[in-house]
Amino acid sequence: MTEPILINGRFLTQPLSGVQRYAREIVRALDRLPHAGLRYRLMIPSGADALPLDRIPTSRLSGPGGHMWEQVRLADAARNHRLLSLCGAGPVGHSRQLVVIHDAAVFRRPDLFKPRYALAHRILDRRLARRARLATVSRFSQGELAAVLNLAPDAIAVAPNSADHLRDIPPDTDILRALNLAGRRYFVAVGNLTPNKNLAVAARALARPPDPDLRLVLVGAHLTGVTRASLMPDDPRIVMAGRRTDPEVAALLRGAAGLVFPSLYEGFGIPPLEAMVQGCPVIASDIPATREVCADAALYFGPTDDAALADRMRTLLNGPHPARLETGRRRADAYSWSRSAAVLDALLDSAWS
C-alpha cells in the first residue's frame, strides 16, 4: 500500500492571516477529494486546535513548538513520506516535499520585517529551493521567486488563492450595530498594522472627503512579531474592528461603500476577491500582484498617493456601480480553492513519479 502524503499542519498553531487561510482552505479542498482519506494525513503539533475534516485523518506529534517541531519532529515522521507544506516553510532536509512559498517579500522588501526574521527566511527559502519542489500563488510571485532563488519560472507551479470561503456564507449583520455602523457610509480595509499593508495611506485619504460621518473600518488590524509596526493617525472616524469571523466580515463587506486595499507589496492579496464575492467595489494599490488578481475589476491608485485614493473613494461614494460589481463577481469566479488543490494534488504525483 502506498504511504500517505503527509500535510504539514504547523499552520494550525498560527494566527489566521492570508497564508494560514490558504493552508486551511487547500486542506479542506483536498478533503473533498474521494480518495483523500487514504491519500493524505494531516500532521499537527500536540497543542494545536484540530481542523474539522471529513476524510483526511489527523495525527498529533509532540515535541518542541515552532520551527523546531517542523525541522525535527515533523521531519522525522515524514522521512518515508511525501510532504505538503503550504505556508512557506518546511523541513529543509526533506527532498520529497512540495512547499508553497507565497511571495518574495523577504528578498524584495526586507525593510518590512525584523532583520533576523528576514535573514532566517531568506536562508530557509534558498535551502528549500535546492531540495524541495516549489509552488506559489501568482504569476507575479512565480517570477519574483524564480529570480531571487535562481530557478526557471516553470520550475515553480502556480496554485492561486480564492475567496470561495466567503461565497455562500450568511452575513452576521449584528456586527454593524456592534460597531455603530448601521446607516453609516464606510469603507473597509483588511490587514495588520505593518508597513507593507500601508493602512496609514487610507487614513490620510479619509481626512480628505469633507464628511464627518464617513468611517474607515480596519478589520484584523493588529501587530505581528515579525514585521515593523506602522502607526495610524488618531482619527475618531477610524474604527478598529479587530479580528472578526467570516460571517461578520461578509456583513461588513456587503454594507461598505468599498474595500480599500493599499498594500505596498503582495504575492497575491485575498481581500479584494473576498470583497468581489460579496458585491463590494474594490480600490487597490497599483502593484503587479493586485493588477494580476483584480484585472479590470478594481479601481487603482499609486500606493503612496492619498489624494488619488481619496478621489477613488469619492467615485464610489457617488455610485451605484452595478457593472463594476458584476465584473468583480466574474473576476472572483476565476479563482477556486478546489482547482488550486487539484493542481497541488497532481503535482505531488508528477514530481516524484
PLM feature segments, named:
Residues M1-S353:
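Carbohydrate transferase catalytic cores enriched for Leloir-type hexosyltransferases
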